[in-house]
Each structure stands twice: as C-alpha cells, then as structure tokens.
C-alpha cells in the first residue's frame, strides 16, 4: 500500500470492513469542470465545441441587417490574461477577470447585383466584448475584491410533464389531468381538463381556450382531429334499423339494449343482460360479422366524418354532429347507406375531444390563429401578417423557442419515441402526441409523472448560468447592431463601430454581483467552503420561491439516494430547498445527477463501475454496499437487501444487477465527517453537519482522535493546504516559503527544476476568521507529487481539524450544565485550546467634498498628543500598535461649512489665524467593543494625487520584499542549474577553457570549484552534444534572469501606477486588526452530533472532577442531553476516543522508557492489524516507525466510516489494549472499561457512581459572545420616529416593547414608565432638556411630546380624518 509523505507521519486506524473500490472524486469538480466548459480557454478556436461562450456566439450570429445587404459573422473569440492576480484583486477591491475579444467579420453585399448575391467587401476585426470573471483554482470568483460562489440550481428539466391536481380543484374530488410542455426558453404550453371533461390549452398561463383551436391552428380539420383520437363504429343503414360491424372488444361489459342474434336469428344475448366474455366467444364462434341494431341504437351517436350528398354535393351532416331522427331521414332520402360514428364508452374511451370540438366556435385554420392572437395580444387588430408571425414565433421560431438538447431527449423519451435527438422547436406531431397521452391518462391508461423525481429535475451549474446571462447580453447587442447594420456601407463603418459591449458587461456584472445564486462565500473554515461550492439550490431565477414551495418538493425522495444528501439542509424556511451533493455524485452531459454502482454479473460483484442517472437506476435491482461477499466477490447471503424503483426488498442474489460503491455514498461531505452517524437521530445529524461549518479555526488545530477517514480528502480538496506539484527534495523552508528541488525524472529539460511555494500568512477570510499556512516539512525531506507541504486553517498534518479533543465527563455539576449548558475547566482557557484569531478590516476614505478635499493627517485640533501617540507623521497607525475601542487609527479632517460668526469669534480668528474651526475631526477610530493589534496597513492613492510618506514607504517595502524574493528564487534556480551542470561536466573532455585549460584534459570537481560559476560556460567541450547542453543551460539561466527582471518591472509598474478608486475618492486606507478571542462564558460550542450548548462557567482547575491519577476532566456535560435527543453517537465517540488516548499514553510510556523498536512494532501491529482495514507497517523503516510513534503519543487517530464503523466488540478490544487490568484497577474502571471513578475537586470525595469519561472532538462555533455583547448610551436615531435604531451594527438601543410596558404598568412604576416612553425614546426636546438639566446639576425630567405621537397624528390625517391636539 502506498502512503504519502504526510500519511506516514500519522496513520489513521480504520475500522472499515470493506476495501475502497472507488476513490472519492475531486470534491470541487462540478464547479471547475462546468466553468472550464463554458470558457474553453485552452481549446484552440477551431476545435471548440458548441457549448458555453461558443454556443452563445453561434446562436446569435450571424446578424443580418433589415434589408439583407449586410451581415456580421462571428469567427472566433479569445481571452486575454488577467491584469492582476487573485491576491492583488482582493487587496484592491477589483474583479479577477479577463477581457473577452471576439473576431467578427462584416460582409457587405452588392445591392446592384440583379440575381444572385455578390460580396462587395469584407472587413474582419477583433472587437472587445467586455470582461468575463475567472474562476480561482478553488472554484470561487473574486468580485470587487470579495470571494463569491455561484451555487448550482436544481430546476425542472425542460420536456413534457403530465400530472393531476390530486382532486383538490373541484369539490367532487374528481382528478383533473393536465400536461405541460416546458422549453429551456420560450412560451410554456399547458393542456388541462376541466370538471366537465373538456380539454383546454393555455400559453404562458394566459386565458384558457379549447384545445381544438390549437389543433385547427396547426392545420387539422375537424375530421382529421376526430380521426386522430377515436376509433369508429361502422353502420350500414337498412330500411328498418341498421347493421353494426361487429368488433367483439367494444361490446364487453355493456348492457344489451335489445336481443342480439346470430345470422340464423338465434338469440345469443337477451335484452337487458350484461355482455360477458362467454357471449363474446359465442358470437365469435358464430362468425358474426354484423349485428342488427334497432333505430334508436343510432340516435345520440356522433358522426365521425362529413356526410355529403353525392349528387348535389350538399353537406347533409358535419363531422361531430349528433345523429338525430331528422338526420337519419335526410340520409335515407339522399340514399346514403354507410355512416361512421365515434366509438365511446364511459370506461376507457371518453368523448373528450368530441365535446371540446362542440364548445369550439372557430371554423378553420385562420379563425383559430386569430383567436390565439386575440388571447396573446388583446386589443390589437389582427392583421394577417401579425397573426402568422405571432403563431410561428410562439413555438416554431428558433430565436424565441428552444427545447434544448435535454428537453428534446426528455420529450422523446416520454412520448415513447426511440431517437433522443430532433429539432429544438416544437413540431405539430409533438403537440398531437402530448394531447394523445393526456387523453389516454384521462381514459385511465398510463401513469402521471412525479415532478420531484431527480430524473425530472436537473442541475444548472455556473457555466450554464453564466452562458444564459451572456446570451441575454448578446441578444441586447444584436438589436442595436441590426439597427446600425443598414448604415454600415454608406458610413463606411467597421465592426467595432457596430458593437457596443456595455449590455454584455452589465449582464455579466449583474449576474456575478447581485444574482440570487451568486453568494458571498462562507469561508469560516475549509469545510464551509467545500460545502458552499457543492450546494444545490431550488431557489433563484427560474426556480421555486420559499412561499410557493410545498411539503413534497422539500421532502427526501427515493431518487436522492447517492445523489443529494438526505441529511444536510438548513433548518428554517429553506429546509429541503437547499441541498448538498452526495459524496460520489456527478453530473452527466444533460445536467442530471448520477451516482456510481458496481456491476454485478451472475451474483458476482465485478470491479466495473457505472454511473447511473435516476431514470436508469429505476430499471435495476441494486444491492446495498454492506451486502456480504466472499473473497472472490460472490454474494453469499440467501436473501440480499436491495432496492428497485425506490422500493426496498429482500431478493435472491441472482436477481441483483448492481451494488452500491460505498456505504457513505448517500451522504454529503459534512455528514460523512460525523463518526457513528448511523447511531444518531436524523434531526440531530442535520444540526451536526450544519454546525461543523460554523466551527472557528483554533490557534493550534488538533486532528480529531475519532474521525471517519474522509478528513484528509476534505482538507486537500478545499485548497487550504499546499500540495506539491512535482516530487523532489525540500531545499529550503521558512514560515513563508517552501522550496523544492524537483526530481530529475519530473524536471523538464532546459527548464528550471525548482518549485517555489509562497505561503499565505495571516489573511482575513470573508467571515473575519484567520487564514494562515504553516509548513509541515523539514529541509531534506523527500516528497512526491500531491503530498501536503503546509497546513492551512483548521488542518493538522493534512487532515481537517475543526476543533479540539476534550476529556469529557457526563455528569451533572451543581446545575451549571442544566439545559445544555457546558462547564469548562480553566486549564482549557489557559492552554489556549480554543483561542482563535479574528482579523477585522477597517476602512477610511478621503473624499473630495463641495467645500474642499478631506485630508488624512496627524494634525487634528482638540486631540491630545496621547491620542495621536500611535500615528506616524502621515496620520496612519503603526503596524504592531495595540489598540482599544475609541483609539484613533487614521487621522482625517473634513472641511466644515462657513457659519455666521459673532464679532467676538471674528476678533479671535483675526488674532489667532484662520484654521481654528473650519474643519471637523472625522478620523477612523476602533469601534466599540473591539481591541487588538494592527497587523497590516494598506494605502491606496488616486492617480495624480501626491502620495504621502507612509504610502511610499509601503510601496518601497513591498518592492524590497519582492526583489528579495526574486533574488532568492534566482539564487535557488542558479544553484540548481549549476549543480546539474557540475554533474554533467565532471569527467567530460575539454577542448580548452579558462585558467589555461589544456586541450584533451578531463574536467574534475576541483577545477570547477576553483572557477567562478559563470566562467563554467567558457569551457569548450569536445563532445558536441554536451556542448549543446551547456549552451542550453546557459540560455535557460539568462532567460530566467530576464523573466525575473520583467516580473520585477511589472510589479513596480503595478505598485507605482495610481489605484482605481470609486468616483470622488482621493485616498483610501485599510487597517487590519488581529483580535484574539479566548473562550469565555456565553460562547456557543458543539460536538459533531448536534449536541450544542453555551459555556456557562469556567471552573478553576482544582475544582474540576478528577481521576484517581489526578487528571481533571476538561468539560462536564449533562447526561440528560443524550436520551431524549437520541444522538447516541456522541457516547460511542467518547468511548472510542478514550481508547484512542489510552493507546497513545501507552505508546508514550514505551518511548519514555526507550523500549526496543521491535516492541513498538508489535504493539502498533496489534492496534492496526487485528481488525478493520490492514495497514502495511512492514514497509516502514525503523526511523519512520519511531516518528509515527512520536506522533501517536497524543492519541492513535481512529477512522470509523459512516455506516461501516467500529462495532461494540472492536471498541471493547481497543479499550482492553489501552487499559491493561492494572491501570484499569488503579483508575477504578468498570469491567467494560468505559466508566471511571471520579473525585470531587472541591472536597476530594469520590462520587458514589462511576462516570462515563472519554475524549470527544468539540468545536467552538462562530457565535461568540464578544460579537453579540453590545451597549449604548446615546447614538443614532431613526429619521421619522426619532427612536433609537436597533441592532449592534447600527449601534442601536434595546427595544422596550409593548409587553415590557405592561410589566411596568403592573408594577405602577409611573416615573420609570414616563422616562422610558419619552426622554429615553423619542422625545427630542426632552432629550436635550435632560442634558441641560444634568449639566446644571438640576436632576429634573421635563417630559414633552413623544415624536411617535406626531407620527400617529400624521398617519390618521393621511387617512383623511382631521385630527388636532387640544393644547388646553
């Protein structure tokens, strides 16, 4: 088994019973693949597929002018490289994007040419088409300096759907069937029955009309309509009565209205008897062709065709007319014998289309189309052209209607056609086929569709959503271009004069900046990033709305299995509408979710893996992943638990066709991180998966001792760690950079064989948490491709580490853990276990105002020197300054308007000079409740504004750092090149060289060391090939030098050019504060099983319950939090964590007494290879075993994968191994070793019962009391009501609401009440009066009129009631 460099350091012992058959796919694949398909940036222009940008261009171009003599054709497009890299965009508040340029061709035809079009001139040109945001390698976008994610949307697939109203519309509870054809873009077409069984259609949910109008509009006559939907009965008229052509099936079940006889007159069915199968058989045996029927049998039947008098050509009766006695009379007069009527019955052949034809008043195709026109455009006069144009545009024009590839495939499958391709617009037979199926459904044949089935819902990813926006922009451009194309020849225009890129840019900008699906990335920790990018939302444009979504849409559907996680979804109004992709789910070419299965042939499980969509899955019998198989892959059990079409059943192995890939395939990433998930109640598991995303990264991340084995995948795929591109040897490491000398076999000849990784240091995330990378390799380490070189936020040795492992005791403790409160030991705080660093960004801008520019300066009047002590000469705070709430960070003054001066002030100003009072202090201060250390300052200056000293110094420092960086890189590159060169030169024969090297001398190491490195290139080698190699290396070094000089120049240009700032802004200063947050009462904490609580007290370490060996517990939780919540997983985690730590202590004890390596090997083999997945410890060298053991001292990490975890028996074995009987006895353990005797820290007495004690991975959540605590004395007031604002962000007050007023009324506290409702709230004059009185030392309240009373009076007046206050 192959272990990566980091895995060898600390192997996670897995309890999985099944081998890994299919690796978890790259977790961000959906986002990255979708967007690269959209851009096709790396595909040569000629080989681009018609999707994404290419599809948008080809669908809109060529654009032809109205007169047809000029057209604009699209040739290809190209994307330039972005001007700023990702980091620079984030700092400057820019969008990380690339300019899109399209090559277009303007073709002008000769108007004079009489017959065939002749090209007069062709102009080709590249035209700028706006900026396209680019995706970062981790699947997000940087828009205006902030990282955003485009969430995928789950919407109803285009195609045709049949459903009924479940009997809710009509009071009788009758099922009303309906069908809907949904295109990708264009008008929706609905068909629906009403309670009277008449079939209507409507376009775009407008007024409904009889469906036969639509059928006539597509060119069918009433006869053709009836022929399409009915079978006919043939009658031959006799002098008395008639002969009916006998079709046996049509008579079964009917009641005979007369005696039915055979040819000989023998009665087979008597009158009023029901005709059964025996009667039919008798009639068939008698070879009956016709049955004589009386006259009244014909009455009331409906004619299928027009009946025309052969002689006169007169229409006696039309199709769909009822047969009456007068009609029969006319028929006999005209001598017509044969007539056809519609065969209908009440059971499975309803007369629906015939009844609809009756209510339809239109006569022919034109009338039908006019009726549709009037419905679509009421009030407009229907001219012939307008009517035709509108009807064709509705469903037949490619510009206005697009079923899309998916829609056509779904449509054809649903109406039972074999081919899945076809035209993208609607065809006449599509409409007919849909109506036929709908009528069949009403007749009781077939099934309606389930719209929540994942075969009927598809996912739209970033690429597709962006393409739709881009196309919308292009369509706007097309309209403008069409107008101007007419003048193209006369005014000699070029393509760039025709195309205005504004509409495209604004469409793209609006989508990425403010669409409902473009969301501010949740960056609290790596898991929240991954989950956000794997989210699938049913909301958004073209999707559902919260209010309209019913219970069914939100519910878990059997087709979610392996595609969408049944657990992870938000609590609250969005429940079930926002979902997460399952671990192995993947999108097919049509956008439907697929999940992998192992193929089973003749009850033998093969290694072939097939991805099945929800529709395909319904056809197969699929076994669970935990079905028992022998070593040959044969299914063993007599009956295997399996699923078919959403139903679970037990079947024999020979019927199994597929098998699940892994037990964890049904859940999402977050849910698969919960150990013992199978023992938790679903509601708590939901909370657990959601709360892991809120875990704040701790100062020192600690891997969970009990994990699930997916932690490594999670950390690596999130992009928070640094991975090696190529294998090699670590050449240099410091806190900010790792240099790797690449292996010879991976280095490219003639290129530099060095990879340099610059780490991210103390950067602010979107949620103000700290992102910081730390190297985990040492100089000289050998690493291979994909190994983790540095840990990021919340990762420990390349594994996700969201919290800390705490020693937990389940017991009540003086009521401090009542109702989910958490009791924590002071030691946890002292050791900084849950301390986190939060980085706050504070901004100040100097604007150009009407009264003059604002100024950033240290020279601020009426501020004491003490307050300016931390500012430099430019008025900006030093880096490293520790600041508190209210301290000045950046000094700024704003010009004040001239006011009328009193003579005294005039005199003072004349004496003391002008400046005294015409500016006010608007400095940036630290907000209330915040304190911290300044870790970074950035100054942005507008082009043409003089930079201050600080800004210049920041630029100089940055350039100096960059130069050092480049010099280091060059040194490393040169060192590497010269090393390779020396290896090549030693032993070669020279033709001459520096220091009088004789011809034919062999070069040795000593000679080379004596020479300056750059003189090596002057050596003339005898071997031509070697000489060429020498020249190549020289060129490559010079090329690299040149590249570095260019890079430095570019960096200098970027830094020294002015910054793009919003209009009216001259300077902007950003100050970054690092705030240290220690754990304190009021912080929210949680485990991974939805067991959340709030810290109630931090107890001195000496008062905590402790074990017999003196070790105190870290956390005390209430045991009553477990049974009612049914999340027993937490108890099992505690037991297994206890075993993990116990094993770690034993290994630590062996290392301390310097036990022999063999003893360590034996003990490790006992841990790793007794049960569960086997680890290959044989391949480890003694040094590696020693390093492994050192890393295991803090606990042997366990993996208990979801639905395939550790059993009770395995946990028992581990506990026995961790706590031999002597230790168990000393600690007072119970026989199963999962409970311990504890002693009360305050009295030293032993608790009378044993206590469940062990280790649980506990998280601190991003709901910190520091962010919520807030107090106000005076502050901002609302404009209208003059009451204080609400909320911490607005520095608002506490609302004293209606109920609180009742309480004061009940107490009779009248003065307090008066104060609350007037001066403390919205009595403006009273407020100032109180202040005056306090200054005078006169403590009296003069309460006036509350402003809200005036508002009330005004509102009453606005209703037209004259109300006035009687002031007497």
UniProtKB/Swiss-Prot annotation:
Reactions catalysed: RNA(n) + a ribonucleoside 5'-triphosphate = RNA(n+1) + diphosphate
One of the GO biological process terms: DNA-templated transcription
GO cellular component: DNA-directed RNA polymerase complex
E.C. no: 2.7.7.6
Domain of life: Bacteria
Disulfide bonds: none
Family: Belongs to the RNA polymerase beta chain family.
Listed NCBIfam families: PRK00405.1 (NF001616), rpoB (TIGR02013)
Subunit structure: The RNAP catalytic core consists of 2 alpha, 1 beta, 1 beta' and 1 omega subunit. When a sigma factor is associated with the core the holoenzyme is formed, which can initiate transcription.
Function: DNA-dependent RNA polymerase catalyzes the transcription of DNA into RNA using the four ribonucleoside triphosphates as substrates.
Record-given protein name: DNA-directed RNA polymerase subunit beta
Species: Burkholderia cenocepacia (strain HI2424)
